[in-house]
Amino acid sequence: MIDKLKLVDHVQAINWNRIEDEKDVEVWNRLVNNFWLPEKVPLSNDIQSWNTLTPEEQQLTMRVFTGLTLLDTLQGTVGAVSLIPDAITPHEEAVYTNIAFMESVHAKSYSSIFSTLCSTKEIDEAFRWSVENENLQKKAAIVMDYYTGDDPLKRKVASTLLESFLFYSGFYLPMYWSSRAKLTNTADMIRLIIRDEAVHGYYIGYKFQKGLEKETEERRQEIKDYTFNLLFELYDNEVQYTQDLYDTVGLTEDVKKFLHYNANKALMNLGYEPMFPKTVTDVNPAILSALSPNADENHDFFSGSGSSYVIGKAVVTEDADWDF
């Protein structure tokens, strides 16, 4: 006989007028102000540009986006959700639910790109590839192990590394195309995603550091060793994944520099020193320029608006206005 679910004696409503950590409100407001949906980005304007890519470049782009979809799916349905039980404040819980929702929006946004630019057969082949690619599946499995484990700090480390590091082998390509005036509307949407992930990685890293403050020196060292070992493991796999994708177009070494750069940023979010020296983090200036808030379509990273992000405006009309 299955035991009945044990219910708590009472449920406490979240009170946004009593804040324990101001960072919760700050990040919540940032995420809400940054809210966007893929349907508002005119991706169809990229069809002509898409047709200028070679079949190999189109396949690479689809595989990159399918890999990003897998990570967003993992983060939206498992990663962010796994952080909720360990939240210190109800407002922290609310932020994690926001993060989980936006990860699902990100995952859906790639399907919007596919349905606009690709055939059903091409889409199915790309998703089949994501299941069969060993390195892609391996990085998902590595992170999943810690999401389902019983150590709250290690979950936050794994989540921060995914948000601030693992996505970036994929984010490189749309920025590369954008720097060459290709797929600029798609790149605009990817910038919106990158803006979200930057906030996610920062916030989860912040909560990790707050939790670490309560631990003993021995425990802190254990977590630091774990963090660098996990990053090494993920990096080694990511290099193989990058080679598998980018060798055919000769971009592997540039992408690796981008990985080094973002690995250091992930460690910074966790409060640790960089792992890679500056000599191997000299990212192509064109990529950094494409990442900037005023790149290409002039998106405003902080308001969620931009020339490619379209929101309808209401205009007062009279009956006579509809007589054509």
Language-model segments: which ranges?
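Non-heme di-metal
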Residues: 1-324
